[in-house]
Amino acid sequence: LLSDGGVHSHIKHLEGILDLIEDYDLPQVYLHAFTDGRDVDPKSGKKFVNQIENKLQGKHTKFASLIGRYYAMDRDERWERVKLAYELLVHRKGSPSSNFEKSLQKSYDQGITDEFIKPMYKENISAKIEQGDVVLFFNFRTDRCREITRVLSQHAFPKYEMKPLDLYYVTLTNYDESFKGVKVVFNKDNPVSYTHLTLPTKQDV
């Protein structure tokens, strides 16, 4: 979630992760962001996008896609909403954009605020989540991360044409004890002991 709301995530955490990626010199890293508009001003997305775009200048990480939290962070089993996020992340389905800030402004002009931003992807960046990829989900609150994590890494939903991928899936906190194969950076039982994240090597990636 791309904001400084501090309820589900914080942009400072993202900036720290981006610095870590540079330290490890990791290739082919893509950012798929969810706009907020609920815990912060409903039209503050442009500011946060600009902040990260500036941060990424000359960096390995590329800003690949945007979608509102209404779709990507549903928690009420509205799978038709989650499907829009899944298809953006996995199949690159959405509206092409050459400039996310301009595209957000266009949405604002149409009365669509950050929470409800429709899926869009950077037209000059061909990035989608594929089998064998590493995924790092940096939200720290658990409730609104479960459904998108479930469809990406846990269970198939044939009715909505969503099936999990074979991913090295990493979360900042433990979203659900029942999830299989998910790596947790800061586990709830003893958060002090989880102060070092072991990243895959270039060979693993």
Label each PLM-derived region with a short phrase.
Residues 195-201:
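Conserved small/polar residues in nucleotide/adenosyl-binding loops
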Residues 40-130, 136, 143-145, 153-159, ...:
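Long, well-ordered, tryptophan-enriched scaffold segments
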